[in-house]
Amino acid sequence: MDFTDQALVLRVGRFREADLWVRFLCRQRGIISAFAFGGCRSRRRFCGCLDIFNVVLMRVQGTRGGLYQSLQEATLLKGPDRLRRDWRRYGVAVNCLRFIEALGAGPDGADSAFTLTLEMLELLETVDVVPPLLPLLFRARFAFEQGYAPRFESCASCGEPFDGTAKDGGARFHVRDGVLYCGRCSAPTGATVAISRETLDALRFVQDNSPLRWSELCFSPTGRRECSRAVDGFIQYHIGLTWENGTFRRL
């Protein structure tokens, strides 16, 4: 099957002398891999655009037996500059892309995943100060977009809207069920994480707003710890991924 699609280059590898394999996040099809035969040499077909973080318009051809896909042509639509020159920003971006690869994205969630990732890269390209929890917040939002969204609106037991204030004893985030319990209600057996008003507001903000606005968030040390525990616990339980020794590992 032949198709044309916009895509973000997630990873590039070399095989044989002049050929490349490329992993893309496509706007319509999600994550795919394709071989770029002659990709190291062909300026006419690929114009030097097969670099990580580049957004391209690509034309792909499937083999007759469906064993692999061959990249026929690619045109550069957009590529970062500052991101490539700042190794800290580069590292944050790579961490986010590795999570995308580890979790995966199919056709159903492709458009939202594509848009979210481009907004994350634009934030890294343009913002003066990178949000310190950006990789964690991106993992949370990407998982939410792929169907793993928890419920932060109200207590899962009594149903009362929850604002996380101290008068009701704070909140507990139930990792397994992805819901909140107020201080007056008992949570079921299972791992829970304390959630303050600050952390709850931040997670709601991330869930509802573009990454381009995440630099507005400001965390206290306590808020950082709570957010990290809640997001890491949720992703480990529901997706089975943990960041270890520079890579995402399946539990």
From Swiss-Prot:
Gene3D superfamilies on file: Nucleic acid-binding proteins, Recombination protein O, C-terminal domain, Recombination protein O, zinc-binding domain
One GO biological process term: double-strand break repair
GO CC terms: bacterial nucleoid
InterPro entries: ARFGAP/RecO (IPR037278), DNA_rep/recomb_RecO_N (IPR022572), NA-bd_OB-fold (IPR012340), RecO (IPR003717), RecO_C (IPR042242)
Keyword entries, A-Z: DNA damage, DNA recombination, DNA repair
Pfam families to which the protein is assigned, alphabetical: RecO_C (PF02565), RecO_N (PF11967)
Function: Involved in DNA repair and RecF pathway recombination.
Similarity annotation: Belongs to the RecO family.
This protein's name: DNA repair protein RecO
Classification lineage: Bacteria, Pseudomonadati, Thermodesulfobacteriota, Desulfovibrionia, Desulfovibrionales
Gene that encodes it: recO
